[in-house]
């Protein structure tokens, strides 16, 4: 009898362990996320795309990647100290005026190469696009919407490089070599134009309320218009600006002060 009870107990123990294994097989791993797992969940991909949006601040007027977050007017005769320069950079504009030797070949503050910032971001956009091609099984329209946003940001970073250096090294995929030749200025501007054309063709004019603030068709056209001015491609700049106007979503503010309200 005792032996029978032991056998029955062992049977139910094994049955329980088997059920546990089945349950564990169904649990998604969330503490460490693989590339493949991200591309199985639309929400996770949206978050992946969101990781590129801080670039708008980083390379904006007050961003750390743009002249250390300080005013570039301090390099000109038009300098006037502003009311807002980020945190510990607050005194930098005055520093540049009073001690111009603070800027040297070894301490070039007007640079976006610090910590390999620009090409690090370009590599991350290319990594997103590479993983998308490899793993995404979402609809073509959904994929284009993600790709359009990421290619906008790739163009945005290349624009920061091109307006300073002209031709730069172009990567449209993950690099296989660190010795790639520098492209011409014309090739660089065309690369930027192509990315922005794709973005403009695949982004919506407006997003729903839940996605307000995302890159739009108008933003892609506007950036292309500005980039083509630097490239001296006047007709392309004109056409892109007209495309923004044709959307009938934007206009000049009645009062200059309203331009700073961020609405």
What are these regions (language model features)?
Residues 10-14:
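Hydrophobic helical h-region of N-terminal Sec-dependent signal peptides
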Residues 20-72, 255, 259-260:
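Membrane-proximal, proline-rich intrinsically disordered regions
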Residues 42-46, 50, 54-60, 85-165, ...:
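Conserved, well-structured interaction surfaces
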Residues 1-8:
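Bacterial N-terminal signal peptides that target proteins for export
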Residues 33-36, 62-86, 171, 204-220, ...:
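Short, surface-exposed recognition loops and adjoining beta-strand edges that mediate ligand/DNA contacts
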């Amino acid at each position: 009898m005792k032996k029978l009870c032991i056998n029955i107990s062992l049977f139910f123990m094994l049955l329980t362990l088997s059920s546990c294994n089945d349950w564990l097989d169904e649990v998604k791993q969330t503490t460490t996320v693989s590339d493949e797992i991200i591309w199985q969940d639309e929400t996770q991909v949206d978050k992946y795309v969101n990781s590129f949006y801080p670039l708008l601040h980083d390379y904006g007027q007050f961003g750390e990647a743009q002249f250390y977050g300080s005013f570039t007017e301090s390099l000109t005769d038009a300098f006037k100290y502003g009311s807002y320069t980020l945190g510990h950079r607050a005194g930098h504009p005055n520093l540049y005026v009073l001690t111009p030797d603070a800027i040297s070949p070894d301490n070039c503050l007007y640079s976006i190469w610090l910590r390999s910032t620009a090409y690090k971001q370009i590599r991350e956009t290319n990594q997103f696009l590479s993983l998308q091609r490899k793993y995404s099984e979402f609809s073509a329209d959904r994929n284009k919407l993600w790709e359009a946003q990421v290619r906008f940001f790739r163009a945005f970073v290349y624009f920061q490089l091109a307006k300073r250096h002209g031709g730069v090294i172009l990567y449209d995929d993950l690099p296989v070599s660190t010795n790639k030749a520098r492209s011409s200025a014309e090739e660089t501007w065309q690369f930027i134009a192509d990315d922005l054309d794709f973005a403009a063709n695949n982004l919506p004019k407006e997003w729903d309320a839940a996605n307000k603030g995302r890159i739009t068709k108008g933003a892609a056209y506007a950036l292309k218009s500005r980039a083509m001015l630097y490239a001296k491609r006047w007709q392309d700049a004109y056409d892109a600006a007209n495309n923004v106007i044709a959307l009938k979503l934007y206009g000049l503010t009645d009062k200059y002060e309203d331009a700073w309200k961020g609405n």
